[in-house]
């Protein structure tokens, strides 16, 4: 705009809100139906069939809560529980090196107040394991009774994934449990 022989930028006289309203923005957009939204929200990750492609190793197992009920979607979904107190280790050893892009852990305790710590590691054949995450969570029967951790990872040629559980950081050393462990 020209005023009194001077070139003046019109935007200098507009408030930031007015500037946004006058900008010529061309956003690409597509109108979608409610049915397509509902079907996409029901999308579920294609989890690995760990029973078919790996061996599970555990330091302890309550016969009523076997590791396969935490690692697979088949049968009862009671999760895994240790038969002994104290730190426990669960390993998933793949038959062949496998790429992973997602790891999901679910823990649940509605009965005991405790602070749990877990360490999740992975390794390639012949190499030392590498830490993915170490985390603590406090369970409380009247508050936080479940923990869900969903990790996006970029891991190639994975031979082993290991979960180390300290079920209770207090001296009592509670019983470790795992509701579900999925990988994709």
Task: Tell where the protein language model's regions lie, with residue ranges.
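N-terminal amphipathic/basic-hydrophobic helices that include classical n-h-c signal peptides
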Residues: 1-26
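Disordered, acidic Ser/Thr/Pro-rich linker "stalks" and the adjacent N-terminal cap
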Residues: 23-95, 108-112
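A cross-taxa feature marking solvent-exposed loop/turn segments within ectodomains of secreted
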Residues: 98, 113-115, 156, 171
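Extracellular and analogous surface-interaction loops
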Residues: 90-99, 152-157
